[in-house]
Amino acid sequence: MNRTIRVSAAGDILIMKRLLPGYQDVLPIREFLMQGEVRMANLETTISAGSCYASAYSGGTWLTADAKCLEDTLRYGFNFLGISNNHTMDYSYEGLASTICELKKKDVAYAGAGKNLYEASRPAILDTTAGQIAVIDICSTFENAARAGSQTERQPGRPGLNPLRFSEKYTITEKHAQDLAEIAEVTGINGLRDLHRQEGFIAPLPEGVMEFGGKMFEISKDGTEGRSSGPNPIDVKRTVDAIREAKMTCEAVLVMVHSHEIRKDNDEEADYFLEEFAHACIDAGASAVIGGGTHQLKGIELYHDCPIFYCLGNFIFENQYVRLLPADYMEKYGLNIHTAASIGIARRQEQSSHSLYEIPEVYRSVLPYFEICQGKCTHLELLPVELGMDRENAEKNIPYVADEKTAEKIAEYLTRVSRRYGTEWEYKEGRIVLHA
């Protein structure tokens, strides 16, 4: 039987306060999302009462929200939330445990983090009228201490997120390689790592590769220079194996990935390793890859008739409403450790030359609804939304259905960033669809 699987999705939910009592756009947005039997998004905060120990690192800002914020998030109709992102471990193991506990209380499916790598990488299973759907969640942007570890016969695993590691390589001319070698010699920038390599604590360099300050450089054979990246084979294999295993019992597998990495110097292009990883997931049997991370839309690719959303941008973006920040944050910005969080956030804004809150694309996104039959996408439409950039502060940073003028701008932008994938988009009758 050829069953149709219906999926709707949103981008990153960075919610820090309750939804406004008079906020009405939750209704049309919920109505659109409820078309899907799988309704998914990335929860980009921990959920706690605010008493968990802060990690010594964060995903940029230490994030935790009250359980009431989770309740408001679910008003949109989501039945799956990914928790693998750069904020997963902002409040250490206790913060992760609290988040999972609150999701279980609300009976929300989740994936992407857990007590060990097995739990973090296993899919959530959602029951639909078309059968069971598996959702895997993974993240490429994290501090190394945040990734989950495997348990062994001798030791327990480590709580954390499902990691997608990657490697970078820079190709330069022989002349530039000589320049770097001279700089390394006079500065000693490679000294400690060279010593550790001699002692066996770091793997030997491959032939033809040199290191400078922890970055790998390869001498170009044809004079071209540039950067490349590739996904970690171990993490790819773990994910591919999970997809194939899930396909044995589920009607479809969806992969959610959170990635802040960029190709060059802007947030519009997916990094090389992310494209390679997404293709590997589809090749292994996944029906779609849904990305988030960089706070603005990236291109959409149809790979073997399966959609890859490289980044859906923001759904709720309330970073400036953080109410708790540890001493580490205040010290970073030269403030007294007892300073209020609002003042700490304002200090960061003061010293930025290109604030996220001044970029229109950060406030624009799309919500995809798509249908899958026999592993392929048979229908795809996008609801254009905007996050109230020009509204009063109390009404900003939450989603509204975009007006026609804004929707057309979103369609034009999406066409531009999707051009490398051969997809063009147009606004038609309240939706953004593939250009005929």
Set out the residue ranges of the language-model regions.
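Acidic, metal/ion-coordinating pockets
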Residues: M1-A436
